[in-house]
A protein has these predicted regions:
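Non-catalytic interaction/Regulatory regions outside core domains
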Residues: 1-123
């Protein structure tokens, strides 16, 4: 698989959804072979409003005296949301509940860096 989206889906079947929000441009990708517990409209607003706000707040706190911010994981009722700050925005990956997104974090970050998706605010 040649694209970063395909590579993320190839990591584990537990990756259900991938979104890139960069410089005001949003691209959302759903694994084609599964249903999603959320609507694409709510996902759209999550990527535009919720995830940037979470990263801003956690990043500001992380930069005070915590050594920065690497990523955030949110545990919703039906899935986990892994949010990685990236230049000009973020990458968001939904994992099924069968996965532990923290256990996948290093693999995800390495993959993103291999595709030159660079972190923002990491110290």
């Amino acid at each position: 698989m040649d694209t970063v989206v395909d590579a993320l889906f190839d990591l584990t079947p537990a990756v259900r959804y991938v979104a890139f929000y960069q410089d005001g441009d949003l691209h959302m990708h759903k694994r084609p072979d599964i249903g999603m517990p959320t609507t694409s409209e709510s996902d759209h607003y999550e990527e535009l409003l919720v995830n940037p706000t979470i990263l801003t707040l956690a990043g500001k706190r992380g930069n005070i005296d915590c050594g920065g911010l690497e990523y955030v994981v949110v545990r919703y009722g039906n899935f986990y949301q892994f949010i990685f700050p990236a230049g000009g925005g973020h990458v968001s990956i939904a994992f099924g509940l069968e996965a532990n997104p923290v256990a996948w974090a290093d693999s995800v970050i390495d993959l993103l860096r291999n595709y030159r998706v660079t972190p923002k605010g990491v110290h």
